[in-house]
């Protein structure tokens, strides 16, 4: 794993949790329901959503399957403008946020 990849992973721990929470609420699923579907404890899911822990690849797959979304959606929702290099931010502003709204049906 390169330094950039490690930095991206560390930087996005909380964002992935927020993305899971946003998508879960959009689907009108409680933490308890999603945790049961993913075969993890409610405390574990809460810890992920609050950024206290980072989900494993297996857990990410289970969460995405349970929410009926591709993993790429979760990655898109976990990216914030702060994660984008300065020279690419214009693209994120023009496409990233509007795309998230379309996917959320807002």
Short names for language-model regions:
Residues 39-54:
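Recognition helix of helix-turn-helix/homeodomain-like DNA-binding domains
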Residues 2-26:
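A short, Lys/Arg-rich alpha-helix, primarily the initiator
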């Amino acid at each position: 794993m390169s330094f950039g990849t490690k930095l991206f992973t560390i930087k996005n721990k909380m964002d992935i949790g927020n993305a899971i929470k946003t998508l879960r609420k959009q689907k009108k699923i409680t933490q308890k329901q999603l945790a049961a579907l993913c075969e993890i404890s409610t405390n574990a899911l809460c810890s992920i959503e609050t950024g206290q822990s980072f989900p494993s690849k297996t857990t990410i797959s289970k969460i995405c399957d349970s929410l009926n979304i591709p993993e790429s959606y979760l990655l898109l929702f976990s990216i914030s403008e702060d994660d984008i290099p300065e020279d690419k931010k214009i693209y994120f502003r023009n496409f990233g946020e509007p795309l998230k709204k379309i996917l959320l049906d807002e």
